[in-house]
Regions:
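Flexible, glycine-rich beta-alpha linker
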Residues: 15-39, 63-64
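C-terminal substrate-binding subdomain of Rossmann-fold SDR/epimerase-dehydratase oxidoreductases
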Residues: 40, 46-177
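Active-site Tyr-X1-5-Lys
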Residues: 1-20, 39-50
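Short linear sequence motifs
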Residues: 3-5, 16, 22, 60, ...
Length: 177
C-alpha cells in the first residue's frame, strides 16, 4: 500500500512483486535457511553419495507448494521493471506439488530409490500456490522451465556441492586421525 501511495501521491516509479518459492543453482542449499527444493536436493544427494537411502521430510509431506526456477524469475523481473505497471503482481508458477512428490522427482533425477522418513518439524502453511492470472494478462509472462528441468539443473549443482563438502569432511577426518 505504501508503494502504491507513493506512486499515486508523489509519482514515484514503483514495482510490487510477490515471489513464490524461487529456487535454482547458486542458492542457499545448506544450513537451515534453504527452500524446500534445495533441501530436498541436498538430502537426496547425501543419500546417493553415502549409500544411505533414508531422506527426512518434515511432517507428512502432503503440504503443497509451487516452485519457480530462477531463470524464469529473472525474465519476469525484467518484464516487470520494463513495464509501467505499479500494482502488485505474483511471480511464480501455478503447478502445485506436495513435498512427497518433490522428493520423488528429485530421487528420479538422481537415479536412486529413497526411503521417506517423516519427522516432526516446521511445515509452514498447508498449501500455497501462485495465482499468475494478473501477470499473464498484464505482461504476457509465463514460466518456461518445467519443475523437472529446473530441479535437474539445481540437483546437478547441489550434488557437486555436497560431493565437495563430503570430500573436505573426509580429508579433515584423515588429517586428524
Amino acid at each position: 500500500r505504501l508503494c502504491i501511495h507513493y506512486h499515486d501521491e508523489y509519482g514515484f516509479n514503483t514495482r510490487i512483486v510477490r515471489f513464490h518459492n524461487i529456487y535454482g543453482p547458486l542458492g542457499t542449499w545448506d544450513g537451515g535457511r534453504e527452500k524446500a527444493p534445495a533441501a530436498i536436493c541436498r538430502k537426496v544427494a547425501i543419500a546417493k553419495l553415502t549409500g544411505n537411502p533414508e531422506v527426512e521430510i518434515w511432517g507428512d509431506g502432503e503440504q503443497t507448494r509451487s516452485f519457480c526456477y530462477i531463470d524464469d524469475c529473472v525474465v519476469g523481473i525484467q518484464k516487470i521493471m520494463m513495464s509501467d505497471y505499479h500494482l502488485p503482481l505474483n511471480l511464480g508458477t501455478d503447478r502445485l506439488v506436495t513435498i512427497n512428490q518433490l522428493v520423488d522427482i528429485v530421487a528420479d533425477i538422481a537415479g536412486i530409490k529413497v526411503i521417506k522418513k517423516h519427522v516432526p518439524g516446521p511445515q509452514g502453511v498447508r498449501g500455497r500456490n501462485s495465482d499468475n492470472t494478473r501477470i499473464r494478462q498484464v505482461l504476457g509472462w509465463e514460466p518456461q522451465i518445467s519443475l523437472e528441468e529446473g530441479l535437474r539443473r539445481t540437483y546437478e549443482w547441489i550434488e557437486d556441492q555436497v560431493r565437495q563438502k563430503l570430500a573436505r569432511e573426509s580429508s579433515k577426518l584423515s588429517v586428524s586421525s
